[in-house]
């Protein structure tokens, strides 16, 4: 059968023009629609022009099967995108962090605070002076008291802490003074003095002294010559004949000579027991430092804090100090007393757990008892508060769950220092006389040291008259080298050297490197990463971009306007205005007729042996030719 071209019938279009006519139906340039069209028309129009994958296919496809297939594909893509987006949001809400290390060379380095304690808390020289001045009655009474009675915690009652808890200010009077200990001080090539130190009290070491507690000194050079150099006298005088202390085998930090040194962040609270290092006498100790800066993220990525230290305002906040104060509060709450091993909380008014109430009265009531009697025969004094403290201290040290209730977090910014310690024999015997002579004659406080006077007198007697000028004149070298010393002189020289090396030490604390290693926390998956992955997910599964979202916003705006117009009673759909007796209808029909004729003039004839049909847009049906 022969088919006739669709152009032979007016208003009938060939099949290859049908898709174009459907698109033109919803295109604003080809339809005379007003802004008050129906919601379906608006959705269809924007759907046919949408950049999202699949939506235009659903709207423009004439075949129902194609519409269903594309609809299923769009639903599948939407489901996959939703699942992946939920995983991305869950990953973001975990607020994980990564830690990066960076070496900074251009920033000034803060010099740390340096806290120094004499390892032997009590000055034997002070005890000697108080003894001869009859000022040590309480000390002697206490020593007799602990020997006369038996305690459940005998080890503690013989400790320096029990001595302080029961004698209070009398015990503090026996502690060391910086004026007696400090023989020489130099910082950054300039002299420093006692006034550059602040004093704090520790229950284990008594008086301790801090350099750079509030000055915030900055360093711009490395090496021992540009750091802090100190020469100390540890005041290791021989005890009175026949007087000896009690060695406490349960104490691992006392009963030795030297100083305990803590290098800590400027303005932070020192803890000599936990963070200190021992510096022995008779050596020159060098402590090299390298600054490390920790920068942490606050909530929600972390739990760092910028709060002040609760309870002790003169110190900066540190995690360790917060825990120590929390331990003290817990012991006070559970035992009704405080511990001298922990920092005091000013807001709590409590006595020490090791205090024996009315111990002096008890001692007087048992004055007739022999303090040399056997342990079994000694009277027993219970100490329930001390037992509670020891029990709680043990529990807190073995179980850290208490930290959850303390509310202690790491500071958001914190400086720490890596330490490397080295020792060398000091001072050499060859230079001892020159050093002692200067300290003895020029340094005011050095003249008060008994060992200094004795050592200087011994060495002065042994010195050759020309030995002091050996550096300038070697004409008497033969006399010096050929001189022989008697056994007593050699013993005198050895005793003088031993006195110097048993009492003196040199400490150098300096920066090894001006670069600061910063460990900085960064979000492992930030908001920018989330937005980037959301864009990639929507683009992969649905072809949606920001512009596509703008199209959706436009749809919402136009539908909202449609609702408002309908509430005002405005017509919806195509608008026809009758002016001059239907001239508008005539114009519309004329334009449609011209459009149909344009398609008919453009089309060609099609032929086929099976038959022919055309689509009549005026009736919306196919008609055979």
Curated annotation (Swiss-Prot):
<keyword id="KW-1133">Transmembrane helix</keyword>
<dbReference type="InterPro" id="IPR001873">
    <property type="entry name" value="ENaC"/>
</dbReference>
<feature type="topological domain" description="Cytoplasmic">
    <location>
        <begin position="1"/>
        <end position="67"/>
    </location>
</feature>
<feature type="glycosylation site" description="N-linked (GlcNAc...) asparagine">
    <location>
        <position position="365"/>
    </location>
</feature>
<feature type="glycosylation site" description="N-linked (GlcNAc...) asparagine">
    <location>
        <position position="196"/>
    </location>
</feature>
<feature type="glycosylation site" description="N-linked (GlcNAc...) asparagine">
    <location>
        <position position="349"/>
    </location>
</feature>
<keyword id="KW-0739">Sodium transport</keyword>
<dbReference type="GO" id="GO:0005886">
    <property type="term" value="C:plasma membrane"/>
</dbReference>
<keyword id="KW-0915">Sodium</keyword>
<feature type="region of interest" description="Disordered">
    <location>
        <begin position="570"/>
        <end position="591"/>
    </location>
</feature>
<feature type="glycosylation site" description="N-linked (GlcNAc...) asparagine">
    <location>
        <position position="303"/>
    </location>
</feature>
<feature type="glycosylation site" description="N-linked (GlcNAc...) asparagine">
    <location>
        <position position="473"/>
    </location>
</feature>
<dbReference type="InterPro" id="IPR020903">
    <property type="entry name" value="ENaC_CS"/>
</dbReference>
<feature type="transmembrane region" description="Helical">
    <location>
        <begin position="68"/>
        <end position="89"/>
    </location>
</feature>
<feature type="topological domain" description="Cytoplasmic">
    <location>
        <begin position="558"/>
        <end position="625"/>
    </location>
</feature>
<feature type="topological domain" description="Extracellular">
    <location>
        <begin position="90"/>
        <end position="536"/>
    </location>
</feature>
<protein>
    <recommendedName>
        <fullName>FMRFamide-activated amiloride-sensitive sodium channel</fullName>
    </recommendedName>
</protein>
<feature type="glycosylation site" description="N-linked (GlcNAc...) asparagine">
    <location>
        <position position="134"/>
    </location>
</feature>
<comment type="function">
    <text>FMRFamide-gated ionotropic receptor.</text>
</comment>
<keyword id="KW-0406">Ion transport</keyword>
<dbReference type="GO" id="GO:0015280">
    <property type="term" value="F:ligand-gated sodium channel activity"/>
</dbReference>
<keyword id="KW-0813">Transport</keyword>
<feature type="transmembrane region" description="Helical">
    <location>
        <begin position="537"/>
        <end position="557"/>
    </location>
</feature>
<keyword id="KW-0812">Transmembrane</keyword>
<comment type="similarity">
    <text>Belongs to the amiloride-sensitive sodium channel (TC 1.A.6) family.</text>
</comment>
<dbReference type="Pfam" id="PF00858">
    <property type="entry name" value="ASC"/>
</dbReference>
<keyword id="KW-0407">Ion channel</keyword>
<keyword id="KW-0894">Sodium channel</keyword>
<feature type="compositionally biased region" description="Low complexity">
    <location>
        <begin position="575"/>
        <end position="591"/>
    </location>
</feature>
<keyword id="KW-0472">Membrane</keyword>
<keyword id="KW-0325">Glycoprotein</keyword>
<feature type="glycosylation site" description="N-linked (GlcNAc...) asparagine">
    <location>
        <position position="372"/>
    </location>
</feature>
